[in-house]
Each structure stands twice: as structure tokens, then as C-alpha cells.
Amino acid sequence: MHRVKVRVVEDALDANNTIARANRDDFDRAGVRVLNLMSAPGSGKTSLLERVLGDLGEVRPGVLEGDVQGSYDADRLASLHVPVTQLNTDPGFGGECHLDANMVRSAIPALSLDDIDLLVIENVGNLVCPAEFRVGEDARAMVSSVTELSLIHI
């Protein structure tokens, strides 16, 4: 049996991180704070946003809604009269289980950044992949359901 060792000398996410920095620069120029909201599917990200988005006082929220396909969550949030941009990973992105910086970059032109103070990126429901990909956010938050608490080690 022949063995070959390959030495990785570059971070595989360098390209993603470069685009994430460009996203961050765009958000900073517009004065927009960005939260990347992550969780397992069905943990309650959308329900949490339905409850919180209307109680932000003078803060003008916007949502970038990530899903593999469909617009159910985006439709729920749009009913709150909050600007929502749907980003499906299935068409053109191969049905990815997360949003990456390039996907977010493709959605920036559809966002009215001048009308938003806080952009919440509701990432695709997945506990593994989203944490690996920076998208240009200021902060990340995790939503966990009660049944998942035994899986989380802090």
C-alpha cells in the first residue's frame, strides 16, 4: 500500500474569510450591525424572531432568511412588516446546509441597508456547518431547544 502525506499550508476557508471581510466592510459603511443566528432545524429561530423583532423600539431590523428551499419562514417574518430577503441554498448553491460569505454577498444588493440598523441572518438550520463559515457578522448566537440541551457542552 502506498501512503502519501499532504501538508495543507493554507486555510481552506481563506476565500470565504476574504469575502466575509468585504461583507463586514459594506455593513460597517452602512452602519448596520449583523447577527448570525444559528441552530438545529426546528429549534425556534423563526419563532424567536417573530417575538423579538417587533419589540426593538427605534432599532430598524431586517432579516436575511437562509433555507435550503422554500420561503415559509421568510413569509412568517414578512407578515411582521420587517424587510426580509430570502436566500435559498438549493438553486445555484447545491442545497448547502449553511450560508457562506459568498451567498450573503449575493444577497446584499437586495437588502436596503440604508433602512436597516440591525440585520439578523437566520442561517440554515444545522448544528455543524454554519459555525465554520464567517459571513461578515458582528456576533453569532445559538438557539437551542430544551431537547437539545444534553447535546451541548459549554
Region locations from a protein language model:
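Charged, amphipathic alpha-helical linker segments immediately N-terminal to NTP-binding catalytic cores
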Residues: 1-11
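Conserved small/polar residues in nucleotide/adenosyl-binding loops
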Residues: 152-154
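Inter-motif core of Ras-like GTPase G domains
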Residues: 131-148
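Hydrophobic positions on the alpha1 helix immediately C-terminal to the Walker A/P-loop
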Residues: 48
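Nucleotide-state-sensitive switch-loop elements of NTP-binding domains
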Residues: 9-22, 32, 52-134
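Hydrophobic anchor at the beta1->P-loop junction of P-loop NTPases
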Residues: 37
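Conserved lysine of the Walker
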Residues: 45
